[in-house]
Regions:
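Helicase-associated low-complexity regulatory tails and linkers flanking the ATPase motor
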Residues: 1-9, 45, 60, 70, ...
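Accessory nucleic-acid engagement/destabilization modules that flank
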Residues: 1-37, 44, 50, 122, ...
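Active-site-adjacent bridging/hinge elements
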Residues: 24-40, 100-120, 139, 304-309, ...
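Conserved pre-motif I regulatory segment
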Residues: 27-128
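Histidine-centered active-site/metal-ligand motif
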Residues: 55, 165, 249-250
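Conserved SF1/SF2 helicase motif Ia
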Residues: 124-126, 130, 138-169, 173
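Conserved glycine(s) of the Walker
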Residues: 134
Length: 715
């Protein structure tokens, strides 16, 4: 049930296909949502975490979407389609696969002449959120929201199912749920069950006291049972699922069948899609909230992105390029990395940035003349010092000339004159010390970790610390064929270098295949080189996910916004900012290199499609004229009481009902007696009456919000 992809014009004509986010456009302007729908606290997550504004905005649009579907349209899919999507989405979707047609008809869908009326699968909304934006926290809060709205009887009672396509993502979800549950009353915690336990839970053998949520691997759903694969019919639940999908697309030959199964599972429920890489037109049109890579970067949560005009075509094994050409491009990349490392050295006493890293992602690893092998050969030659001074100077001059007028994606950013001058002063000895951890050239030595079949370390014999890590599926072919003649030593003190790469500042280069990069989170990448990644939708998704994982920034512990934004928000003092500002842009940037023109266009196209409208960074932020030119100090924090803002009438409702007997309130709301004591003794200090706050007016909803907020906050 894929919509036909619209033809896209060439970037050469400067025409970019901007997705139509129809549902988001409507929800952003929807203002008549009844107050009861906002009865839960959207910001509280745990004693250590609260949601960013953009995460709360995602939940607010989830509320608006559910309100529109269930309250304004009465849960009627045809009415929802007519009101929101008529004339935007086609009335019917063609289905050419007879097995899918039979499957849909079997489960009660109407399919006429191989066409499915679109309204039948329109009970859905998507959340287009960048890798690294914390969408898992939003998913956990969405579970709490659904439970709260079901308890208030404003949406139907249904079971909740969470699906994602990898075990590590399930593990990540479990970890966030565990943190969310800490300190909550039993009825408020989320209880996770593997989907195979569904019958036990529903039959009462395992009786949950909290919010039951089922989970499973999305890619293991099928039409028959086999090993870990499950027959979806055994968990059909009459289509009454609130189905939450997190990156639940694998892109293989069974994708269409799985998407059909997902639509069947939520036929009488609702579907929530979370992804950093939407590609189908229906995903964009039904998108309720957008905080994609472009928004993530523009609002200062990620690094600036620069896509180099330099062409890595010399690493295409099918073409005959000279060793000098390979050497020049590697020199440019290494000089750039050296410059960023040196910039970080200048500010690290004041701002605790990551250690910059070069990430090399290749398509082939072990075949003859593989992408990895060609890159490694070039690395070896430079490490040995087999370059002419004129070649080094030429590479440096070309790099500086390119960076002088560098056009960063999404923003109007320029590298400082100070940084460009620093690049001019870099010597080959600086490069050896910064990149290769050595003061002089040398031959490469291979460091193997016994029992570790996926990692190899590389160091220069002239140095004392490894400088590079290779992470691939199996190192055996490399040891046997590619590294013949190299000295191989064994290292016993570490079993998994990759797992500790964020803390290990010695490693400056990470080389890996496409497969290894899934699920890796790090602030460290400043340069990414894609070598022969291919083209098409799969390559675009990989590029987007890779760049998304490389843009994370954390100048101070647990503060994940760029320094300029922190300065404008008065989170650092003016003196500190003035001392480091000339060096921050390269450290807060991700420089992307691609193999050849077609690959580079894939990257450009992917990034261009992330932009809804033309904006510059200056358009997004305003400096308060009252504070311009004045000293902005770093605030010092002290413990203070928590404050909940409520409409005055809601506060009076709370005051009145707090006079009820403890046993009644504990029984009705599962609130801890200590919370009741705290609220009775300090209500005026803890709850501020403000007329601009939404009025709820329903005692049950007011008390749920009050107790929910302070039950989490009081430790």
């Amino acid at each position: 049930m894929r919509l036909k992809e619209k033809d896209r014009r060439s970037l050469d004509n400067s025409v970019i296909s901007i997705p139509n986010l129809r549902l988001k456009t409507i929800l952003d302007t929807l203002e008549d949502v009844e107050e009861v729908w906002y009865a839960i606290d959207l910001s509280a997550f745990s004693s250590k975490k609260t949601l960013f504004d953009y995460q709360k905005n995602a939940l607010e649009n989830a509320i608006k979407g559910l309100y529109y579907f269930y309250s304004k349209c009465g849960g009627n899919k045809e009415e929802f389609f007519e009101n929101v999507y008529k004339g935007i989405l086609p009335e019917t979707l063609p289905i050419r696969n007879k097995k899918l047609i039979d499957l849909l008809k079997e489960e009660g869908f109407v399919v006429d002449e191989n066409k499915l009326p679109t309204y039948q699968i329109i009970n859905r909304m998507g959340f287009w959120m960048a890798t690294g934006s914390g969408k898992t926290l939003v998913i956990v809060k969405l579970v709490e929201l659904l439970s709260g709205l079901m308890n208030l009887k404003v949406i139907p009672q249904k079971d909740i199912l969470f699906l994602t396509h990898r075990d590590d993502l399930i593990g990540q979800f479990k970890g966030h749920v565990k943190e969310f549950n800490e300190g909550r009353m039993p009825s408020k915690i989320i209880q996770l069950y593997e989907l195979k336990d569904y019958e036990d839970v529903k039959s009462g053998l395992d009786n949950p006291t909290g919010i039951p949520v089922f989970y499973y691997r999305a890619d293991l759903f099928d039409t028959e049972e086999k090993e870990k694969r499950v027959n979806f019919r055994n968990y059909l639940n009459n289509g009454n699922w609130y189905l939450i999908l997190d990156e639940a697309h694998k892109g293989d030959k069974d994708e269409s069948k799985r998407q059909t199964i997902f639509n069947i599972l939520c036929k009488n429920g609702f579907r929530f899609d979370f992804s950093a890489t939407f590609t189908e037109e229906i995903d964009f049109i039904t998108c309720a909230y957008n905080f994609n890579l472009a928004e993530f970067v523009k609002q200062g949560y990620g690094k600036h992105i620069y896509v180099s005009g330099e062409n890595l075509r010399s690493f295409n094994r099918r073409d005959d390029f000279s060793q000098e050409e390979k050497q020049k491009i590697l020199l440019k990349i290494f000089i750039l990395l050296t410059g960023i490392i040196k910039a970080r050295e200048k500010v690290k006493d004041r701002v605790h940035y990551h250690k910059p890293l070069l990430l090399v992602l290749v398509n082939s690893v072990s075949v003859d003349d593989s992408d990895m092998e060609l890159f490694f050969r070039g690395l070896v030659n430079i490490a040995k010092g087999q370059i002419q001074d004129s070649d080094f100077q030429g590479a440096k001059d070309e790099l500086i000339q390119e960076l002088k007028n560098a056009n960063f994606r999404f923003e109007n950013v320029r590298l400082s004159r100070e940084f460009l001058n620093l690049l001019r002063e870099i010597t080959f000895e600086d490069l050896l010390e910064s990149v290769f951890n050595s003061k002089s050239p040398g031959t490469i030595e291979v460091v193997q970790i016994p029992q570790n079949r996926q990692e190899l370390l590389f160091k220069l014999k002239s140095g004392d610390k490894p400088f590079a890590l290779m992470k691939i599926g199996d190192i055996t072919p490399w040891l046997r064929k590619k590294l013949e003649g190299y000295e191989i030593v064994e290292r016993f003190e570490e079993e998994n270098i990759f797992a500790k790469l964020n803390e290990d500042e010695d490693i400056n280069i990470l080389m890996g295949s496409r497969a290894f990069y899934e699920g890796w989170d790090s602030n460290r990448p400043n340069v990414i080189a894609f070598i022969n990644i291919g083209m098409g939708e799969d390559a675009k998704k990989f590029v987007l996910q890779s760049i998304g994982r490389g843009v994370r920034i954390e100048p101070f512990k647990n503060i994940r916004r760029r320094l300029e934004i922190l300065h404008k928000n008065s989170q650092i003092d003016k003196e500190t900012y003035q001392q480091v500002k000339d060096w921050t842009t390269p450290i807060e940037s991700l420089f992307v290199f691609g193999t050849k023109a077609s690959n580079l266009e894939t990257i450009l196209q992917t990034l261009a499609e992330q932009t809804e409208e033309e904006e510059t960074l200056g358009d997004l932020f305003e400096i308060n004229p009252e504070v311009q030119g004045k000293l902005l100090l770093v605030p010092e924090y002290k413990e203070s009481e928590l404050i909940l803002r409520m409409h005055p009438e809601d506060k009076e409702i709370a005051r009145e009902f707090l006079e009820l007997d403890d046993r009644i309130l504990v029984c009705m709301f599962d609130v801890h007696p200590k919370v009741l004591i705290k609220l009775r003794n300090n209500l005026d200090a803890l709850v501020h009456a403000e007329h601009q706050e939404r009025k709820i007016g329903i005692p049950e909803a007011v008390l749920k919000r009050l107790f929910g907020y302070f039950s989490v906050k009081f430790r």
